[in-house]
Amino acid sequence: MATVPFPILCLPDFVLQKSLKLMGVVEHLCLSILSKNIKQLIATLKGYPKCFSFKFVPFTSLTVVGERFKHFSFRFDIDESSQNANLRSYTDEGTYITLTVPGFTVKHWIEHVAYVLCRNNSIKLVLWEPNIDEVYEIVKDMRTVEVVIVSSEIQSCHLLKLFPSLRYLGVYKAPISAQILTYNLLHLEVKTKVTLNDILISNCSNFSISGNDVSDKELNFFMRSWIKGSNPRLTKFYIRNSLRVRDPYLETVLFQNIDYIETHKKIYWRTFEISRPDGTKADVMWDPLYNSYFNMTVQH
């Protein structure tokens, strides 16, 4: 009688499902390359994330975060001549295994991991290098919902053509375009230079800014413009300052010519309420001690 190389393949599906639930990510990835049946069974397990993060750095890597594990990393060892790739799976403890499938490229591995761990194929890209078109060729069949641009050489406006499903965008070094600002993103995080006009024309729901010194007068103009109807989709506007890099916000300057009510006053934060003529209200909060942030949240 011939020996079965992988006895687990002979188990009935209901027994196999129970066994799979007792296993971890490493075991699942090892088993998923043995047969299509096991691959599909693992993909239906509950608890895996709906989205995973794919980082393009000097070496290609992929990070998965979900309920069944806090953090799981992958690296690709690429054969430059054939473009075949081995997958190294890392755990939080720093241990890893290497998986090899003949003919598998980086694209094949990404699609495989996405199917097994994230069935809807929604991904987050972190771009450290300017080769965005090369990245697109690898992930074009997936639904890219979030992109973080670390490279200063990527034109942010190019992203909208490549990734029409984009909802979350982080721009850390690249210049930001008016096309991006006026696009209906759910969340825009900016660490590059922005102006008052950039803020006023933005059409995102959640706008987060770091590393910019937005003055009290500019914030006053922004709030007065919001009261008059600007930024209609805005739900949250957030500025994070480095500690003690500027003078404290002045209440008299911030709310000049604005009707407002102070709702809370603490050592580390103060909260005020402003409103539009139609009754829409917003909470304005900042840190009076360290001056580390300014936050405006529209009430719904």
From Swiss-Prot:
It comes from the Eukaryota. Disruption phenotype: Reduces the frequency of axon regeneration. Results in shorter regenerating axons while non-regenerating axons have larger bulb-like structures in comparison to the wild-type. Pfam families: F-box, FBA_2. Expressed in D-type motor neuron cell bodies. InterPro entries: F-box-assoc_dom_typ2 (IPR012885), F-box_dom (IPR001810), Zygotic_Embryogenesis-Asso (IPR053222). Residues 5-51 form the F-box domain. Substrate recognition component of E3 ubiquitin-protein ligase complex which mediates the ubiquitination and subsequent proteasomal degradation of target proteins such as mdl-1. Positively regulates axon regeneration by targeting mdl-1 for ubiquitin-mediated degradation; probably thereby reducing levels of mdl-1-mxl-1 heterodimers, allowing free mxl-1 to form complexes with tdpt-1 and thus inhibiting tdpt-1-dependent sumoylation of ets-4. This is F-box associated domain-containing protein sdz-33. It comes from Caenorhabditis elegans.
